[in-house]
Curated annotation (Swiss-Prot):
NCBIfam families: hisS (TIGR00442). It catalyses: tRNA(His) + L-histidine + ATP = L-histidyl-tRNA(His) + AMP + diphosphate + H(+). Belongs to the class-II aminoacyl-tRNA synthetase family. GO terms for biological process: histidyl-tRNA aminoacylation. Its main location: cytoplasm. This is Histidine--tRNA ligase. The gene is hisS. Homodimer.
């Protein structure tokens, strides 16, 4: 048997992982400005953590979860999304306690798992970056979080992004709308897809965002959630819209957008961009004020979003956006002869300990091959170290771009290379 990676997974090799590191680092910097702190949860959870919060009737739970019984006969699932594990952690660790500052803001990054048909930008092991904010029902929290996502997408370089906005109202408004939707769809049941016929019985709102052609036709004249909002829900949604407008964030009201998870209420949103004629959601989220209490904590407001890293990178690639990744070596040491081997090791270590990105040859190759390696690594400077240089204690350092050279002592390189580096036209941080 040929050993290969499982279907729906990928190896992220160095050329690609540099892009991942850039995106993750960029997100950390943005989140830090908004006072978010990182939380890391297990990649597997008890089955009930996901099934009860995400919803027993959702596609995630009924079709896509990786779940199994461990050796202790515990029902375990690999996490398919990030919010439920963070809420579980928030409650379990009593982060709702009075001494914890509110709102409490967390972000997470890591792998998620769903058993679905692999395709471009959608894998069975995929990676999410997300944020969760607990303790504020203020609509300004909705808007701050949405605008943070908009800022991140703009600054990372995603083009043509449109914000789709909707509300699911409070539980009372949602219940009234649910009944109206059942009344509307029941006479049309036989025209719906098999999945949507099931959804009509279990969670009729999910029919609204079905991708099946017959379902899209059926919901064209469906009632709008906006007609069933009570005063509280309407006031919250109006405030969100007004604040977005005050911040200059454009949006589209999309009453057929309901999101694929059952825990949302009030504001929900998606950032969508068009790629090759297809609408791709790059970031999505919303408010979930009942989820903390559902996990056994006190009544606590919540708001958050998640974005898929694979899809983000796919969109950047399709849009021709080159991330500003710096992979160049500061120094490459070409080594000539066995007598220079030990000194080359000492020198490259000294350079690294001064903060320089440095590499040397270990393979006793001809100089031409070593110089080619320096070019492949885009080395800014080149040092050729042979037995004669070791004996004299003097070496030539060359700017590998301009070919300018300086003669310096090995001791100077070992103790203060930054002075030489700057003399050759480069700057140290």
């Amino acid at each position: 048997m040929k050993l290969q990676k499982p279907k729906g997974t990928q190896d992220i090799l160095p050329a690609e992982s540099a892009k991942w590191q850039y995106v993750e680092g960029f997100a950390r910097e943005i989140f830090k400005r908004y006072n978010y702190a990182e939380v890391r949860t297990p990649i597997f959870e008890h089955y009930e953590v996901i099934s009860r919060s995400v919803g027993d009737t959702t596609d995630i739970v009924t079709k896509e979860m990786y779940d199994f019984y461990d050796k202790g006969d515990r029902h375990i699932t690999l996490r398919p999304e990030g919010t439920a594990p963070v809420v579980r952690s928030y409650v379990e660790n009593k982060l709702f306690a009075p001494e914890v500052q509110k709102p409490s803001k967390f972000y997470y990054m890591g792998p998620m798992f769903r058993y679905e048909r692999p395709q471009a930008g959608r894998l069975r092991q995929f990676h999410q970056i997300g944020v969760e904010c607990f303790g504020s029902s203020n609509p300004a929290t909705d808007v701050e979080t949405i605008s943070m996502a908009a800022y991140f997408l703009k600054e990372i370089g995603i083009q043509g992004v449109k914000l789709h906005l909707n509300t699911l109202g409070n539980p009372e408004s949602r219940a009234a709308y649910r009944q109206a939707l059942i009344d509307y769809l029941t006479p049309l049941k036989e025209t719906l897809s098999k999945d949507s016929q099931r959804r009509l019985e279990e969670n009729p709102l999910r029919v609204l965002d079905s991708k099946e052609k017959e379902d899209k036709v059926a919901v064209e004249n469906a009632p709008s959630i906006l007609d069933f909002l009570d005063e509280e829900s309407q006031t919250h949604f109006d405030a969100v819209r007004q604040m977005l407008e005050n911040l200059g964030v454009d949006y589209i009201i999309d009453t057929n957008m309901v999101r694929g998870l059952d825990y949302y209420n009030h504001t929900i949103f998606e950032f969508i961009t068009e790629i090759e004629g297809n609408d791709l959601t790059v970031c999505a989220g919303g408010r979930y004020d009942g989820l903390v209490a559902y996990f056994g904590g006190p009544e606590t407001a919540g708001f958050g979003f998640g974005l898929g890293v694979e899809r983000l990178l796919l969109i950047l690639e399709k849009q021709g956006v080159a991330l500003p990744i710096e992979n160049a070596l500061d120094v490459y040491i070409a080594v000539l002869g066995d007598g220079a081997n030990v000194k080359a090791l000492e020198l490259v270590q000294a350079l690294r300990q001064q903060g320089f990105k440095a590499e040397r040859d270990y393979l006793n190759r001809k100089l031409k091959a070593q110089f080619k390696s320096a070019d492949v690594f885009a080395a800014k400077t080149l040092i050729t170290l042979g037995e004669s240089e070791v004996e004299s204690g003097q070496v030539t350092v060359k700017n590998n771009q301009t070919r300018e050279e300086v003669q310096v002592s090995l001791e100077t390189i070992s103790q203060n290379f930054s002075e030489i580096f700057e003399k050759l036209g480069f700057y140290t941080q």
